Amino acid sequence: YNNTGGGGGFATGTLAVTGGQVLRISAGEGGYGVINPSPNPQGQSATEFFGAGPGSTGGAGIAGVFTTNSSTPTCHSAPGVYMVAGGGGGSGGFASGIDGGVGGGTIGGAGGGDGATAQANNNGPQECSGGGGSQTAGGQSLAAGPQTSAPQITNGAFLQGGSGSYGGAGGGYYGGGAGGRPGNQSPGDRVGAGGGGSSYVGHPQITCGSTEAGEACMSSGGSPDP
C-alpha cells in the first residue's frame, strides 16, 4: 500500500503594515506518508513541526504570519495571528486508501479515504482517522487502542494539532485530530490518518483574504499562485 500525507492549505490576503512593525513568518513543513513494507508506521520516530501534533506519521506544521514568536505555539494569542495556512495530516497505514486529511480552507480535511473531505471536529470518514480543524474548534483525535505505552490523547486546539500514537495531526488556526487504531488492535488492523488543520484570514487588518483547501495526493491548495 502507498498512503500519502495530506496536501497543505493555501491562504492569501493583503496586510497593511506600518514603519517599524515587526512580522514573524512561519514556513510550514510538509507531513509524512508511509509506503509498505517500510517504514513501519509504528517504527518511525515522531517528528513534530511548529503547530503539528506528534504521531508515527508526522503531520505538517503551520505556515503563517504572526506578531509574536513563531517558534512556540503557546506564545500566541488570537489578536497576534494575521494569517495561517493549515497543514495536512500524516497518513494511516497497514492498508491502502488512508491518506492524511488536507489542510483547509476554513475547515481541514478529515483523515482517511483521499483526505479531501472537509469535516470539522468529528471522526474521520475512515475508521479511527482524525477530524479536521475548523474556525472555532480542533479536530477530534481517536483512541490509540489498549497500549500501556500510549501517549496522552488530545484533540486539536488553537494553533496546535492533536496528539496520538498513529497518524499525526496537521497544524492550523485550529489543528486537526490525530489518528488512532481499533480497540482490539489485532495484527494488520487499519491505522487511522491524521486530520488537517484549518486556514485563517479573519484578522481585521487582512483585506481581500481567501483560503483554498489542499488536494488529494499531497497537492497543495493555490498551486497556480506564485
Regions found by a protein language model. Name each.
Residues 178-226:
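C-terminal subregion of chymotrypsin/trypsin-like serine protease catalytic domains
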Residues 3-129, 139, 143-145:
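Secretome/extracellular-domain signature
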Residues 121-123, 129, 138, 194, ...:
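N-terminal targeting/export leaders
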Residues 146-165, 178-179, 183:
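Extended serine/threonine-enriched, polar tracts that run as long, contiguous segments within proteins
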Residues 2-4, 52-56, 164, 185-192:
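Short consensus segments that form the blades of beta-propeller domains
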